[in-house]
Amino acid sequence: MTSLTSADALTLYGETFASRVLIGTSRYPSLQSLSDSIAASRPGMVTVALRRQMTGGTAEAGFFDLLKRHAVPLLPNTAGCQTVAEAVTTAHMAREVFGTDWIKLELIGDDYTLQPDPVGLIEAAAQLVKDGFKVLPYCTEDLVIGRRLLDVGCEALMPWGAPIGTGKGVVNPYGLRVLRERLPDVPLIVDAGLGVPSHACQVMEWGFDGVLLNTAVSQATHPEIMARAFAQGVEAGRAAYLAGPMDARETAHASTPVVGMPFWHQDGGGA
């Protein structure tokens, strides 16, 4: 890693994190698979939910022991909440259980698309900020909603790339890039819809600050390998963004300039 990228840490609410990858902890085939994926991706944070469900019904005690062993900062979420009251209550319960003021605020407005409820999201975010939480709201790429969330005290946003669990990658590149361009100083972490490492690399090349992954890793045939691949994709995309990519052109442009005679003719032309 170059000095340029090594000095470039993710900063949220004044705190710095070692990685721009955030990993969810749901739906892994086993606790060992989850543990291996965390070790492979070395995430800055891992998300946890009070309503967590894991395939195989693994004991909760083992799950929390695993998290303590990896010593990665926890980001509780309000997954499954559909009302403001439910989200606020769940956030307060999560603070008591996990001992942290961090909260990933999820408030779903549609069961089919799992799209966030923008009105309820703003109301819940405002209340939780007043209650002392560091709120990371899961939202769409809607610029106006993003600004309203910032107005009520959120210091970072988590816009989706596509609906949760679809793996489609970014379905509205224009909207997501406009959000980045219009909010240049706000930490933006793409959350939901990414399916393969190239999706993560792409949004990092656009200047996004990080990605949150769950299904793309947990439902891969080999989660540990996929987790490592995503971490590498995020690192490559961020490095490319910092390097300053060339501008795309509509016409061809020779990479080697033609100046004077070919080198083999410059000394009399003979071999």
From Swiss-Prot:
Compartments, as annotated in UniProt: Cytoplasm
GO cellular component, as recorded: cytoplasm
Protein name: Thiazole synthase
Source species taxonomy: Bacteria, Pseudomonadati, Pseudomonadota, Betaproteobacteria, Burkholderiales
InterPro entries: Aldolase_TIM (IPR013785), Thiazole_synthase_ThiG (IPR033983), ThiG (IPR008867)
Enzyme Commission designation: 2.8.1.10
Pathway: Cofactor biosynthesis; thiamine diphosphate biosynthesis
Catalytic activity: [ThiS sulfur-carrier protein]-C-terminal-Gly-aminoethanethioate + 2-iminoacetate + 1-deoxy-D-xylulose 5-phosphate = [ThiS sulfur-carrier protein]-C-terminal Gly-Gly + 2-[(2R,5Z)-2-carboxy-4-methylthiazol-5(2H)-ylidene]ethyl phosphate + 2 H2O + H(+)
PANTHER family, per database record: THIAZOLE SYNTHASE
Top-level class of the enzyme under EC nomenclature: transferase
GO biological process, one term: thiamine diphosphate biosynthetic process
Species of provenance: Burkholderia lata (strain ATCC 17760 / DSM 23089 / LMG 22485 / NCIMB 9086 / R18194 / 383)
SUPFAM superfamilies recorded: ThiG-like
Highest taxon in the source lineage: Bacteria
Subunit structure: Homotetramer. Forms heterodimers with either ThiH or ThiS.
Protein family (similarity comment): Belongs to the ThiG family.
Keywords per UniProt: Cytoplasm, Schiff base, Thiamine biosynthesis, Transferase
Principal place of residence: cytoplasm
Gene name for this UniProt entry: thiG
Entry binding sites for 1-deoxy-D-xylulose 5-phosphate: G165, A192, G193, N214, T215
Molecular functions (GO terms): thiazole synthase activity
